[in-house]
Amino acid sequence: MSSKSLRLIVVGRLRIPFWRAAAEHYYKRISCWRAIYETIIKDGNSSLSVSQRKAMEGKNILAALEPIDIPICLDEKGKSISSQEFANFLRNYFENTTKRPCFIIGGAFGLDSSVCNIANDCLSLGNITFPHELARVIFLEQVYRAETLLRNIPYHH
């Protein structure tokens, strides 16, 4: 199994302690097998309109991307896949490219179209809406689950 890294670009800090603790729990578990880097983009100014805020956040996300990154958006309009399909999705990137998968999670209002338009892929966590803090934790759990599936470690039932 390759030990390539992955990256997560997120809008906003996890301000509530239990979200931070849950995210740290999964970062720690994932990092036993794979380097995972997080870049936090500052939330847009709350005095701006929703579209202005998303545009500002989008501009900052695009500026944070590195040449090695393969941008993959997490968005409600993205493709919904199973945990096993997600594990295979990651395996494909780790085994078939020299670049790093870079998952992008927007803020409270989602991602600006400028970010979605440059993404290689766009995935959804399902048809229901989550607070962006919970979406981050769910995504990290799915990365951990994918790693256990790829390594045949009992976790996914």
Curated annotation (Swiss-Prot):
EC number: 2.1.1.177
Pfam families reported for this sequence: SPOUT_MTase (PF02590)
Keywords carried by this UniProt record: Cytoplasm, Methyltransferase, rRNA processing, S-adenosyl-L-methionine, Transferase
Catalytic activity entry: pseudouridine(1915) in 23S rRNA + S-adenosyl-L-methionine = N(3)-methylpseudouridine(1915) in 23S rRNA + S-adenosyl-L-homocysteine + H(+)
Stored CDD domains: RlmH-like (cd18081)
GO MF annotations in UniProt: rRNA (pseudouridine-N3-)-methyltransferase activity
First-tier enzyme category under EC: transferase
Superkingdom of the organism of origin: Bacteria
Family of the protein in this entry: Belongs to the RNA methyltransferase RlmH family.
PANTHER family associated with the record: METHYLTRANSFERASE, RIBOSOMAL RNA LARGE SUBUNIT METHYLTRANSFERASE H
Subunit structure: Homodimer.
Record protein name field: Ribosomal RNA large subunit methyltransferase H
Gene name as annotated: rlmH
